[in-house]
Each structure stands twice: as C-alpha cells, then as structure tokens.
From Swiss-Prot:
Keywords: Chaperone, Cytoplasm, Disulfide bond, Redox-active center, Zinc. Belongs to the HSP33 family. Pfam families: HSP33. One of its GO terms (molecular function) is unfolded protein binding. The lineage of its organism: Bacteria, Pseudomonadati, Pseudomonadota, Gammaproteobacteria, Pseudomonadales. One of its GO terms (biological process) is protein refolding. GO terms for cellular component: cytoplasm. This is 33 kDa chaperonin. InterPro entries: Heat_shock_Hsp33, Heat_shock_Hsp33_C, Heat_shock_Hsp33_N, Hsp33_helix_hairpin_bin_dom_sf. It comes from the Bacteria. Under oxidizing conditions two disulfide bonds are formed involving the reactive cysteines. Under reducing conditions zinc is bound to the reactive cysteines and the protein is inactive. The keyword Ligase does not apply. It is found in: Cytoplasm. It comes from Ectopseudomonas mendocina (strain ymp) (Pseudomonas mendocina).
Amino acid sequence: MNDFSQRFLFDDTDVRGEMVALRESYAHVLAKHAYPQPVAQLLGEMMAAAALLVGTLKFDGLLVLQARAEGPLSLLMVECSSARELRGIARYDAEQIGADADLQSLMPNGVLAITIDPSRGQRYQGIVDLDGVDLAECLSNYFASSEQLPTRFWLKADGQRARGLLLQQLPPHHQSEPQERQESWNHVLTLADTLTAEELLGLDNPTLLHRLYHQENVRLFDEQPLQFRCSCSRERSASALASLGQADAELLLAEQGGSVVIDCQFCNERYAFDAADIAQLFAGAGSEAPSQTRH
C-alpha cells in the first residue's frame, strides 16, 4: 500500500501518534499542474498534514487546509474527507519563485485556515498566521495557542513522496500528575525531533518507530488507505450553470461561441455544455440529466 495513514499508541504514557505516507495520490495531484519544486513540496506537506488531522478526528465530512498570502504563492489548499480521499491545488507566480524558496518567501504575512465541515452539525474554522519556519511549525503553533490537545507535526515532501508524523498528548489516563505528564510529553517530542528528512521520507513506519522509540511500549495499528479523489462532476457543473438562471446561462453560451466549458481547478477535468444541454437544464424538474457530450 503506497498511500496510507497509521495510528500508534504509547501504552504507558498519555500520547498517541499518527503517521502518513503518500505517493500515488501526491503524484496524481502534481500530474495535473506543472508546479515549481518548492510549491510541489509545500503542497505535499499540506496533503500529509490534512491526512494526519483527519486521522485524529471522529466525524463524517470534510477537512480543509487553506493558506493564503500576497506573495509568489497566493493559495495553497488541500481537502481530505473522512473517507480519506484527498485533493489539492496551488496558485502561484512561477516567475517569482526561486529554486530554494521556503514558506516565508513564498507566502509572506500569510494565514492558514483549518476548516472542519461535517455532513451534519456545525462547521468549525480556526485561523493561524503562517509565521513559522515551515508548515509543521505553523500547525504546531496553532494547537499550542488554541484550546486543543497539545499536538506536534513533522512534515516532509520531495516531489515524489510526502510523509508526516503527528504526536498528540491525550487527557490523563495512565498518568495524572502534571509534572510526570509533561516530562513524558517532552521525552517523546525530543526523540521525534532527532528525525532527519531522509529518515522521515525513507523509513517504513515500523522501522521509524523502532528508530525513535525502541525503549518504549508502542502499539502500531493497521494501515488505513488514502487516495486521490476529486469531488467535481458533470452534475455539479450543471447545477452551477443552472444557478445562473436561464437568461444568463444562454448569454454565457453565446459569449463562448456555442459551448460553455467549465474546468475543475483541482483535477483539470473539463465539462462542456452545448445549446441542447443548456436548454435541457431549464426544461423543467422532470427533465433528464444533461447529455454526456464533451468537447
């Protein structure tokens, strides 16, 4: 399995972890756009982060990470569903991006929004400044500054692989004394901080855990598959056209030379609607779906 998340627990301390490995879904996202290497790396890190966060949540819905700035990289966005389906996109000015560009040069004065959109229930959004040296530090800062469980991230991507590690301190169970809990938490963090980029990207999960925590009692759970999937569809595109109203849809059809084309920014899928399709959209509630003709 090339794309998966995997949970682990420390038996003697109140800490849990999550690891993510992405290859095929990451390649699928990069294949849709000719991203510069620094952008591709950041996008991979954000994909890994989104998958890590979904692994810590019990919900049915969508998690969205969206970073915005007024720099060379104006938008970085990843969605991960509770079904562990990922997609991502970036908007950038290639002429302003150097080969060694980092987060701060790409997205100066940026902000990161973390949105949890459940199928049922209230939508939640948290916002943090992109003021860390990398995305992992920004996310860790968000959890440190909010009323969340203490959480740390380690993220790496190289244009072919994206990997992530998350550690989270749980409410008291094995340990109740605050100083003991803090010492245990600091201990697992200190060991994780010794990870190199090569190790995080290259080691399989059992080997990585043994490398870090061979003196601890750690339980590693089964792998949970992750995959790329875009939620766009012809039906959604048709609904977007229908929402314009018949007069505006027909005007758009005329302006575009007899065929309205809607492109998905995430996957580059193209949905085309001709005059017959537009007429069918407004033919009444009992009409059939638009034809499957594409141009």
